[in-house]
Amino acid sequence: MSRYTKKDFPPHNVRRFLEPGPIVLVSSAHKGRTNIMTMGWHMMMEFSPSLVGCLISSGNHSFEMVKASRQCVINVPTADLAATVVKIGNTSGRDIDKFKSFGLSQKPAEQVRGPLIDECYANFECRLSDSSWVRKYNVFVFEVVKAHVASSPKYPKTIHYRGDGEFMISGENTGRWRRLFRPGML
């Protein structure tokens, strides 16, 4: 087991080590308009029902669309979409139609109004479950009401944000410690 020599580190940069899961694309629809935003701040909050907490900045165009419609689609892109994902994050849906500008295909969702992004590996249709944290923290708690996941590959290469413009691609999967794992402890 390794021991590490440590130095002081700026607390505002700890996100580099704690960023949650993969970067996702949140698609939304309201009053005849659609939008896509890039999001890295999300977390699983419950297994059943599947609840996902999502931080959306109040200055973001998607914030108002999601707040008003009370629903969205969380789309999981793979590494081959990395450049597009970054470009989407650098533009505002107030100014452009992101689906057209970035050549992405909209597919109708089954249970919400926001469109699925067909080029993404997975699409999770979500309805707002709890808005009590929106005013104070800009955190929406969504319930996944319908999930669509590609059958292959089993573990796609996803994009993860490390902070300050640094990204990571998901790596090797291993079952090496599976025998130590106790699901009852979750």
Q: Model-derived features: where do they sit?
A:
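Basic, polyanion-binding surface patches
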Residues: 1-186
